[in-house]
Amino acid sequence: MSMVYINIFMAFTVSLMGLLVYRSHLMSSLLCLEGMMLSLFIMMTMAILNNHFTLASMAPIILLVFAACEAALGLSLLVMVSNTYGTDYVQNLNLLQC
């Protein structure tokens, strides 16, 4: 495994750990999710280019489409929560609270 793959895997791991540790604000969770999607995109693209998988060449584009949809939904949820509650805490998203 080359150093580039190790660095991208470490970026994914750091983003995952950031998602697990900084769960209080919705914006930090969204940024960590975007970091994970970006590292997955780069790793998938490099694997396809290095192994000459011509049939799977559309997979990174599809991943980018899903990442854009996830970002749009996340930002709309952030705007809705900020307008409703005044903060972007994740604990405000609990539907069981009165």
From Swiss-Prot:
InterPro entries reported in the protein's UniProt record: NADH_UbQ_OxRdtase_chain4L/K, NUOK/Mnh_C1-like
Enzyme Commission number: 7.1.1.2
Keyword Nucleus included in the entry's annotation: no
Example of a GO cellular component annotation carried by this entry: respiratory chain complex I
Location in the cell: Mitochondrion inner membrane
Swiss-Prot/TrEMBL catalytic activity: a ubiquinone + NADH + 5 H(+)(in) = a ubiquinol + NAD(+) + 4 H(+)(out)
The keyword rRNA-binding belongs to this UniProt entry's keyword annotation: no
Transmembrane regions: 1-21, 29-49, 61-81
One Gene Ontology term from the biological process aspect of the record: ATP synthesis coupled electron transport
Pfam families for the chain: Oxidored_q2 (PF00420)
Topological type in the membrane: Multi-pass membrane protein
Keyword annotations: Electron transport, Membrane, Mitochondrion, Mitochondrion inner membrane, NAD, Respiratory chain, Translocase, Transmembrane, Transmembrane helix, Transport, Ubiquinone
GO molecular function: NADH dehydrogenase (ubiquinone) activity
Superkingdom, natural source: Eukaryota
Subunit structure: Core subunit of respiratory chain NADH dehydrogenase (Complex I) which is composed of 45 different subunits.
UniProt function note: Core subunit of the mitochondrial membrane respiratory chain NADH dehydrogenase (Complex I) which catalyzes electron transfer from NADH through the respiratory chain, using ubiquinone as an electron acceptor. Part of the enzyme membrane arm which is embedded in the lipid bilayer and involved in proton translocation.
Family note: Belongs to the complex I subunit 4L family.
Protein name: NADH-ubiquinone oxidoreductase chain 4L
Gene name of this polypeptide: MT-ND4L
